[in-house]
Amino acid sequence: MAIARGPGTEIIRSVHYKIDDSNTSDMDLIVGVQHHIYTVLSIICYADVGCDNLTVWVDGYDAIGGTSGANIKLFKTKALGEGQTYVFNDKFSFNGTEPTDFTSEPLSTAAEQDLIADQATTTSQYLRCTKGHNNDQWHLNITYIDQNNA
C-alpha cells in the first residue's frame, strides 16, 4: 500500500546519503515544497575515513535581513577519525518555501510572523551540507517529519 502524501498528512521520512565524491560542493539533503513544514528529528553522521568536518545548514529566508537564500548554520562537526559517529538529535523545523518579503526587517509584528508561516512564494528552502575536504567520506542518515499543509 502506498503512503498517503496528500494535503493534511504528516509522515515520517528517512533519507540516507553516502557522500564520497571528490568535491566540496553544497549538497541538498531536503528540498522544500510549498506549504510543507519539515521537522528534523536526527542527523547521524558517520566518518567512513578520517574526516575534517561536515557543515549542515538551512538555506532560506533570513527574517532579520529580509534576504533570500541565506545560509543559517545549524552545526559543524569537529574532525572525526575513521569509524567515528556524530549524532545531531536536537529537533528543529523549517518551512518548505520562503515567505513574501516584508519591508520592516527585522521581524517585529504578528502579521509579519504570519507572512513567514504562509509560505507565499515558490522559492524552496533547503537543508544542505558540505564536507570540509574533498577526501572526506561521510554516511548520513536523516529522519524527519513532513507535514503537508497544502
Map each language-model feature to its residues.
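A short acidic, glycine/proline-enriched capping/turn motif at secondary-structure boundaries
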Residues: G83-Q84, N134
